[in-house]
Amino acid sequence: MNNIIVGMGEALWDVLPEGKKIGGAPANFAYHVSQFGFDSRVVSAVGKDELGDEILNVFNEKKLKTQIEQVDYPTGTVQVTLDDEGVPCYEIKEGVAWDNIPFTDELKRLALSTRAVCFGSLAQRNEVSRATINRFLDTMPDIDGQLKIFDINLRQDFYSKEVLRESFHRCNVLKINDEELVTISRMFGYPGIDLQEIGRASCRERV
């Protein structure tokens, strides 16, 4: 078995007032892991379009290994605008390529060689990518030192209690910030307790 570290989920373009740049938490995770000299992969999907080709070219230029399928959906974009106070507002396009990541034979082979994977909630907003992520997690060999990192990304209304609970069950590492802890506490009925205890309660959802 290899010690491959995977970032799985959305790979997209953030379209900012000053121009576009590649975004997506899983892609960023895989890139930063690679900068420490580890063998990483980005697993996602892009469209058969110019924006998709650009993403693949940028990753290739950065020498970032990928397993990205080109599918019959447009490459994902996030339109970023600033309100009157300079706070960014995000419009995440739906029905895009990373909503439709296929589970291929090649992806199955990668799962069998993966030591750690980081996945989020945003890429599970569509049942196709959600099923692929869960199948990848289930295919990974059950060995000591294996990491299944759930990076909660509560964006717009692209999450549900059921999807979050399922991911709690499948992960063994949970990445969550204070703001997300408050949202989780309301969703799962933990009001009136401190953030540390909310974190413990969230972890108990795995049991």
How should each PLM-predicted stretch be described?
Residues 11-13, 34, 44, 171, ...:
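Generic helix-packing signal
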Residues 1-6, 58-60, 66-68, 84-206:
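Ribokinase/PfkB-type carbohydrate-kinase core domain
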Residues 4-5, 14-87, 94-101, 105:
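Substrate-binding N-lobe of the ribokinase-like
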Residues 9, 44-46, 152:
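Short beta-strand/turn micro-motifs composed of small residues
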